[in-house]
Amino acid sequence: MKEKINTLLKHAEDIWRKLCKNEIQAKIEKYEKEINQKNFWNDPKRAQKVIKAQSILKNKIDPWEELINKIKDLSDLCEIAENEKDTNGLEIEFNTLEKQYKDLLTISYFKEELDANNAFLTIHSGAGGTEACDWVAMLYRMYSRYAERKKYKTELIDLLEAEGGIKSVTIEIKGEYAYGLLKSEVGIHRLIRISPFDAAKKRHTSFASVFVDPVIDDKIEITIKPEDIRIDTYRASGAGGQHVNKTSSAVRITHIETGIVTQSQSDRSQHKNKDLAMKVLKSRLYEYYKSKEDEKNKSKQDTKKEISWGNQIRSYVFQPYNLVKDHRTKFENSNTTSVMDGNIDNFIEEYLKWKSLN
């Protein structure tokens, strides 16, 4: 046990030193000097932005210092326990600290300004007809369960039902680092299974696309003029055209220049649906223009490959064997039931590691 504790301590101290040696500590000190200036609050919007930026950076270092102190305390307890030949309970405490270490390691991979923000997650059905719509419903449940496991909150923004499942769905996932974690899910997801909709019990392949955008807070200004958009209202409807209500409460917003379309029909209030659709539009415009400016990264518009065979980032195979495999990181898990119940943390962690090296 002593050796395991010392190894964990060494790893934690190595990460802490790397974080302090890079520009993080210098930026924290720079923000601290700015905050202490007499005229700091003359520009409240700028002041709030600085405080949030400093808080995000501190949250990358302070928890490591706390963890290191806890591991050192456990190391001292281990020596006492071994001398008294009573090590009961040390394993439980070690496992708790090891999990904290893994969680903090994941957070250390986040580099982008909005990684700590909430996220909009959208799933669209691809090739596969009814089977593909059922696949969207399965993924919707998977991400909802993931959010539940993380103690994140979710809000339904838009849902278009279809025979056998869901044609498309957009949800907001609210929680710290929701965007930073879930952007690993962007891409084509492939399902291979014996279709419950096929009387001949043949094997079918279906596709769905997942897109993730950061929720833009008030500290980032995205200006949208009335003449830049077209707003359409329509009746919210369910599968087969069944009306959820008889008023035109659903809202669709089209950004004319980019062609980006957002919509919401989750609320009975047209005003609320308009606000939600506008909120999603701001997030997608931020990502659109950001990717346009960044020549090193491909625009999301360029990465929207055809939702079909050969472009998938991850495959979920239920027949003839059980396996979920990420084609980017090569990480795989044969427990498909667990994965579909939202246990995708390992896939996300492996992606973040892979992304940091590529």
Curated annotation (Swiss-Prot):
Keyword Protein biosynthesis found: yes
Transmembrane spans: none
GO biological process, one term: viral translational frameshifting
InterPro entries tied to this protein: PCRF, Pep_chain_release_fac_I, Pep_chain_release_fac_I_sf, PrfB
Protein's name in the database: Peptide chain release factor 2
Protein's gene: prfB
GO molecular function: translation release factor activity, codon specific
Protein family per UniProt: Belongs to the prokaryotic/mitochondrial release factor family.
Cellular component GO terms, alphabetical: cytoplasm
Cell compartment(s), UniProt: Cytoplasm
Post-translational modification: Methylated by PrmC. Methylation increases the termination efficiency of RF2.
Alphabetical keyword list: Cytoplasm, Methylation, Protein biosynthesis
Protein biosynthesis among keywords: yes
Modification N5-methylglutamine, positions: Q242
Coiled coil region boundaries: none
Function: Peptide chain release factor 2 directs the termination of translation in response to the peptide chain termination codons UGA and UAA.
Other comments on record: The gene for this protein contains a UGA in-frame termination codon after Leu-19; a naturally occurring frameshift enables complete translation of RF-2. This provides a mechanism for the protein to regulate its own production.
